[in-house]
């Protein structure tokens, strides 16, 4: 099966001139130039054909990866369903055993025999049951979808799976997919040609070996396609090993899980639309990061933690230990009609039940196969890759052990809004669970900001004319300095007046003088906690003379910055193994620490004693903020709740329940609004006394930090997607957006609202000047 390469590499490139032995063979300069030009044109044509061949192979490899991810999710669903059904059978057997003794003797014998007969299911019976269900579902879909879907030989839609609870449907699907292993992937490729030019620069497909069925399916292809593919796979396997080695060297045991999900060379053109519009010119498919599956919860987190490790990559977790509450991948997107952030879940509806689970597929699989989690059939899913911009750069590092969440994060395209560091402006509606009729405002453009009323109705927000203009509203931000800390920067804070920046990494806080931009070295280094423990939060007292530092240790360090050499003047010890966040009361008398055990510790800074603990969070408390008058405290936790506390009475006031873990929050200095950043990539802005809220959708991954400007008119959020977003309070008009080279784990805004500092996973902090 060796492919004839004569078409691609003809042996005789140019017709030979007639042989004239009697006449000497001479070239003039003009003829030589013509021949060189001719040769160049030929090489150019050869290059073009090779380039097309390469693109074709790359696109087919991407298709293979999508199918692999689909099978991965399907096998996971089958495994869960199998265990579920086994548990149900066990319980029913126990009930039968308890009930049978109450029957009469003759009935007991009959029932026992009937139970034994019921347990004896033959393969013939199983095949008949599966065949009947398969036929019924084929017929139902033939009526429901009159237009044949080309990737299927008969034009019939494969059996859809109504829910994970249908084991027969799952079995039917698996057998159907096995039987249709000859589907022509190459034909499907035509449906994607318009996307490949755009995609090939940024999605690098992982070197996953195709399954046997797909190898059989591709026999009709030219043999060299696969030989080229196998060579490419071997090369990529080496690349993967090299990539993991280099990541380990630069990120300390792969602490930063997110550095590989963006291509540094991705296009960064300016956005082609007005930022005040709540949407874009081109309506697109819904797209969203995948729910995090249990196999990759640790590896998909984004700020350091001492607790969890991902065994498959020996990778430290970088969030406050992110947990799933159920064995199935969590669908953490708030949905219209469900009171996702109400004070309590609606009685009768189990928490976590999301009717639009299907819209949160782990990857925008461009074939009409449903996944085991009830994917809603969508016309655009058939052969339409929803990843818009850079989409061929980082499936390269996805191994079979990694979850679909990682694949989705890698395939997620970037969305650009601002002239700061613009990039691909198509965000493709990364809005989970929003019906198609809500994907735009009257101008016909998809929206990213939605108002959610008390009854759960979602409507795109029409921005007012002054959304992005007026006093106190920035125009953009300019990067003016980079502070090379040397470790992942998990905490930053700015002094008042704006002169020093404090960056917290592993085992120390470094102090930088930003009044001299040319100064590339820290003015001092404050060693605290243990050398291997990450600083998670550092807070300055309003007088600027005291710094409090907390992190992956049970102690908080209090630093005296007014001394000739900064020194630790006290340490506060709690029972929790880690502190995730700190807040200081306006009068500087009290410090609040978010503990990994879910408690909020209240410290008397004068007497250096623990005076109280607020108990309520059932998992780690991850973020905190305090009202300007010092009477109310807001905390967010990994238990999917945000709680408010009355500091005068020492009791909990409110509780807001979400379907996703809370990673960051900020309370507006002017009151009324609370912004919450979540694991599911949403930012929600809640009114503190009314049930209304806004839901904002520009982040591609976990929202790791959030901070309000001191004027209260705008706020910033940062995420695992490398983005710094600035939003208008409260409705979330995008003011500007900047993209960094790695996960942005922390941020702070100066008291005069003129500077922003961010800390990132590539071991540096970045200083921005806010331009008004």
UniProtKB/Swiss-Prot annotation:
SMART domains named in the record: WD40
Stored Pfam families: TLE_N, WD40
Region (Disordered): 1-24, 183-359
Major localization listed first in the record, in broad terms: nucleus
Expression (tissue specificity): Expressed at high levels in the spleen and ovary.
CDD domains: WD40
BP GO terms, sorted: mesoderm formation; negative regulation of canonical Wnt signaling pathway; negative regulation of transcription by RNA polymerase II
Region spans: Q domain: 1-137
PROSITE patterns for the chain: WD_REPEATS_1, WD_REPEATS_2, WD_REPEATS_REGION
WD repeats: 484-522, 530-569, 574-613, 616-655, 657-696, 698-737, 739-772
Chain intervals with Polar residues compositional bias: 318-329
Entry PTM: Ubiquitinated by XIAP/BIRC4.
Region (GP domain): 138-205
Family: Belongs to the WD repeat Groucho/TLE family.
Swiss-Prot/TrEMBL domain comment: WD repeat Groucho/TLE family members are characterized by 5 regions, a glutamine-rich Q domain, a glycine/proline-rich GP domain, a central CcN domain, containing a nuclear localization signal, and a serine/proline-rich SP domain. The most highly conserved are the N-terminal Q domain and the C-terminal WD-repeat domain. The SP domain is involved in EFNB1-binding.
Protein name as catalogued: Transducin-like enhancer protein 4
Native organism: Xenopus laevis
Native organism taxonomy: Eukaryota, Metazoa, Chordata, Craniata, Vertebrata
């Amino acid at each position: 099966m060796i492919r004839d390469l004569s078409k691609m590499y003809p042996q005789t490139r140019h017709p030979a001139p007639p042989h004239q032995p009697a006449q000497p063979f001479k070239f003039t300069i003009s003829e030589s130039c013509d021949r060189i030009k001719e040769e160049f044109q030929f090489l150019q044509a050869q290059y073009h054909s090779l380039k097309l061949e390469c693109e074709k192979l790359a696109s087919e490899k991407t298709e293979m990866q999508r199918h692999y991810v689909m099978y991965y999710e399907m096998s996971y669903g089958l495994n869960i369903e199998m265990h579920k059904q086994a548990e149900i059978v066990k319980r029913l057997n126990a009930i039968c055993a308890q009930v049978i003794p109450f029957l009469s003797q003759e009935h007991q014998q009959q029932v026992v025999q009937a139970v034994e007969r019921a347990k004896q299911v033959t393969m013939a019976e199983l095949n008949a049951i599966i065949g009947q269900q398969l036929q019924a579902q084929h017929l139902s879909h033939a009526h429901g979808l009159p237009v044949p879907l080309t990737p299927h030989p008969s034009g019939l839609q494969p059996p859809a799976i109504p829910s994970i609870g249908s084991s027969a449907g799952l079995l039917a699907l698996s057998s159907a997919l096995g039987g249709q292993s000859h589907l022509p992937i190459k034909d499907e490729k035509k449906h994607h040609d318009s996307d490949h030019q755009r995609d090939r620069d940024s999605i690098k497909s992982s070197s996953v070996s195709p399954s046997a069925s797909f190898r059989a399916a591709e026999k009709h292809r030219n043999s060299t396609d696969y030989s080229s593919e196998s060579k490419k796979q071997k090369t990529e396997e080496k690349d993967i090993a090299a990539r993991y080695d280099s990541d380990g060297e630069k990120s300390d045991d792969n602490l930063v899980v997110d550095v590989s999900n963006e291509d540094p060379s991705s296009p960064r053109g300016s956005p082609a639309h007005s930022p005040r519009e709540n949407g874009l010119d081109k309506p697109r498919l819904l797209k969203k990061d995948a729910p995090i599956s249990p196999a990759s919860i640790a590896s998909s987190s984004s700020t350091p933690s001492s607790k969890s490790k991902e065994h498959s990559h020996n990778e430290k977790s970088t969030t406050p230990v992110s947990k799933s509450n159920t064995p199935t991948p969590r669908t953490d997107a708030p949905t219209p009609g469900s009171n996702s952030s109400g004070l309590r879940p609606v009685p009768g509806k189990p928490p976590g039940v999301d009717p639009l689970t299907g819209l949160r597929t782990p990857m925008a699989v461009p074939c009409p196969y449903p996944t085991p989690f009830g994917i809603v059939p969508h016309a655009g899913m058939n052969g339409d890759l929803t990843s818009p911009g850079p989409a061929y750069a980082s499936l390269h590092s996805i191994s079979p052990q990694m979850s679909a969440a990682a694949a989705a994060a890698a395939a997620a395209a970037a969305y650009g809004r601002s002239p700061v560091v613009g990039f691909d402006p198509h965000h493709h509606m990364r809005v989970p669970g929003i019906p198609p009729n809500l994907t735009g405002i009257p101008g016909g453009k998809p929206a990213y900001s939605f108002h959610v009323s008390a009854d759960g109705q979602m409507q795109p927000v029409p921005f007012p004319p002054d959304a992005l203009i007026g006093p106190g509203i920035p125009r953009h931000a300019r990067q003016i300095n980079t502070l090379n800390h040397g470790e992942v920067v998990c905490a930053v804070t700015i002094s008042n007046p704006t002169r020093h920046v404090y960056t917290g990494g592993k085992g120390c806080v470094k102090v930088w003088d930003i009044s001299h931009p040319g100064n590339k070295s820290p003015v001092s280094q404050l060693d605290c906690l243990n050398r291997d423990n990450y600083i998670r939060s550092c807070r300055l007292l309003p007088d600027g003379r005291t710094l409090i530092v907390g992190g992956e240790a049970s102690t908080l360090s209090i630093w005296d910055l007014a001394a000739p050499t900064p020194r630790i003047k006290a340490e506060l010890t709690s029972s929790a193994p880690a502190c995730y966040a700190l807040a200081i009361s306006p009068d500087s008398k009290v410090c609040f620490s978010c503990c990994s055990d879910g408690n909020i510790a209240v410290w008397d800074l004068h007497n250096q004693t623990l005076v109280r603990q607020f108990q309520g969070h059932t998992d780690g408390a991850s973020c905190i903020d305090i009202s300007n008058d010092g009477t109310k405290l807001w905390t967010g936790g990994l238990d999917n709740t945000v709680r408010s506390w009355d500091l005068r009475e020492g009791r909990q006031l409110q509780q807001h329940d979400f379907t996703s873990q809370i990673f960051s929050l900020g309370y507006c200095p002017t009151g009324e609004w609370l912004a919450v950043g979540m694991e599911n990539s949403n930012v929600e802005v809640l009114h503190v006394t009314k049930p209304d809220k806004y839901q904002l959708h520009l982040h591609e991954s976990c929202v790791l930090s959030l901070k309000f400007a001191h004027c209260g008119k705008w706020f910033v959020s940062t995420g695992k997607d490398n983005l710094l977003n600035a939003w208008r309070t409260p409705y979330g008009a995008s003011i500007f957006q900047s993209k960094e080279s790695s996960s942005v784990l922390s941020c702070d805004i100066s008291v005069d609202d003129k500077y922003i500092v961010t800390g990132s996973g590539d071991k540096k902090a970045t200083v921005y000047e806010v331009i008004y």
